[in-house]
Regions:
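A conserved beta-strand-loop-helix scaffold within acyl/acetyltransferase catalytic domains
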Residues: 11-62, 66-78, 130-154, 158, ...
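Acidic, Ala/Val/Gly-enriched low-complexity intrinsically disordered segments
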Residues: 4-7, 14
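Compositionally biased, intrinsically disordered low-complexity segments
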Residues: 8-11, 88
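Acyl-donor binding region in acyl/amide transferases
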Residues: 76-147
Length: 227
């Protein structure tokens, strides 16, 4: 993988589309956008967190950014073979700044570029949190991606009144079983408690193939970016 920047020129209708791939946060210029999952700030957090290698693809027309796509190659070490696993994770399908441009075409070019780059070091690429399941469908298929059904469970805690009514019977049984076995729920207030909580979650998620809990350093860098 290149160490800093790579640039490709593609044809987007009558206007050439330039794809620039960034591998170092120090080389990323000021970019527009408000999507946290494709931001320069998250790129730098990935860069500073052990086990993460960020890749940022910026699409430009006439030297003006029209879209960007942030991905991260994550390395995990497991007790069972293969001991070291690298996978690329992307949240969403990027952020776009030109409402008149064809987002599907731009995404197709960025996706192909990302696929070629990421598969050099990772064994799979996973896109999560897709807002529109049909957006980019043809591009995903053309690049050999497959759809995976995934169950999402969301329990709103904005109102604590009658919160049990929003839980499923199986979830309530799990909670009661945990309380019966001595589980406690309380806020972590000190750095030591937060560290212990993070270590516990990493231990729980370490045996799960599709789930991951980042290093505590990820959240420390996130806090530094927000304060």
């Amino acid at each position: 993988m290149p160490t800093e920047i790579s640039v490709f020129l593609l044809s987007l209708q009558a206007m050439p589309l330039k794809l620039t791939t960034y591998y170092r946060g120090s080389k990323v210029p000021d970019l527009p956008g408000t999507n946290t999952f494709h931001s320069t700030e998250l790129f730098r957090i990935y860069e500073e967190t052990p086990g993460y290698t960020p890749i940022l693809i910026v699409a430009s027309e006439d030297d003006k950014p029209v879209a960007k796509l942030l991905a991260a190659i994550r390395k995990s070490v497991r007790m069972f073979p293969p001991g070291i696993i690298k996978r690329c994770e992307v949240y969403g399908t990027g952020e776009y700044f030109n409402n008149e441009a064809d987002k599907e075409i731009i995404f197709s070019d960025m996706l192909q570029r990302l696929t070629n780059e990421a598969l050099r070091d990772s064994f799979l690429i996973e896109f999560r949190n897709l807002e529109n399941a049909m957006f980019g469908y043809k591009s995903f298929r053309d690049n050999q991606y497959i759809a995976i059904n995934w169950l999402r469970v969301r329990n709103s805690l904005h109102s604590v009144e009658k919160v049990e009514e929003r839980f499923s019977p199986s979830r309530i049984r799990q909670i009661k079983k945990g309380l019966k076995n001595g589980a406690q729920v309380r806020e972590a207030r000190t750095k030591e408690e937060i560290l212990c909580f993070a270590q516990m979650l990493r231990h729980v998620y370490s045996s799960k193939i599709r789930r991951h809990f980042p290093s505590i350093k990820f959240f420390q860098h996130l806090e530094n970016q927000l304060t």
